[in-house]
């Protein structure tokens, strides 16, 4: 009862929490496309609208390499990105997984309370993160800004996070396609990859004029340099920062990104086909596929939320208590973490750095793969993709496993699905690590999230167009 009372503590706030009503009937495909486009447009506009009242946003950014993963844009309404939503999801999953909160997903009331707790916690986290950003001087010294501007900045950030929460809920309720969180991440990262590959912006560095876009720069140097071998080497392996501290991408980064795209798409076809038959329609037989990437991009998204919050807290504490032993254990910071736990949990800056500090590399690889595997296992229990949930879905459609009695179907699914979840998380973590070490454009995690999301939308579009009446949620999207 105590666990249920904990959930019930949020009930009094339910009337005050904004909610998108579920559609009364199935939304036509064209309307889903329209709502998805409108949702994306609102997000992109918010990503370009600067915060009102900031003095400066030029201070060092401890979350720079995570911004693509969090769909965040510095100094705009999307400063926090999807961080409050994903952090809330992560915390509630950990509480449920550790049985500090007991939720029976078979009960509709418990499922509704679970969603309510996630939303309530996301709003609290948004206000907390916004307050921390403002009071730590991310936009100028609070003394210079004044109490009124500080409060206005906090309200802007929190309100923007609430809008993102509602946009995601709009799509999740069935008005649009897929998940708002995944859509926002994929869009931001596709934009970033395209820009780094084809940007026409020029920079003057030591060896002359360089284009920011790796492909554009390759064409330019091959036509303008007399030494073609040197031009080819420079196009593939150029490195270094511009005067404005921008890391120029090269063709190796571009092809590494394409390689990651190809590998992820290739792995999408790896699956275990479970034969099923209908009890209602005699002679109907089909298969229920359990994919290798069973939980899709969810594990790496939650792992990124965990590390981003750790890094932000570590940076915040280091700025105030830099001589404290425990604070230094969490992380010693300059522009990025240089030692401590935050350093070892962040990816190596390059493949060369990975070889120079193998302990850092091994800790990062182990943590990423283990955290992703753990989150993957926790996720299936709360997302409707556990063996018991799948067995109920099949039973509700009067489908049973061929060669098995109805009573033994759950046992067989329990043998397959948890293993698939663990393996899915570990593989996704390994892909993210490999992408980082290969030097994919942006970050390995961002490219992985982008690829899995695009493929997920491709599959969903196929189902919508074909009107598949037997489609089951094989790779659950982010709630």
Swiss-Prot record:
It comes from the Eukaryota. Its main location: endoplasmic reticulum. Disulfide bonds: none annotated. Residues 56-76, 141-146, 267-354, 435-440 are lumenal. One of its GO terms (biological process) is SRP-dependent cotranslational protein targeting to membrane, translocation. PANTHER family: SECY/SEC61-ALPHA FAMILY MEMBER (PTHR10906). Belongs to the SecY/SEC61-alpha family. This is Protein transport protein sec61 subunit alpha. It comes from Schizosaccharomyces pombe (strain 972 / ATCC 24843) (Fission yeast). The gene is sec61.
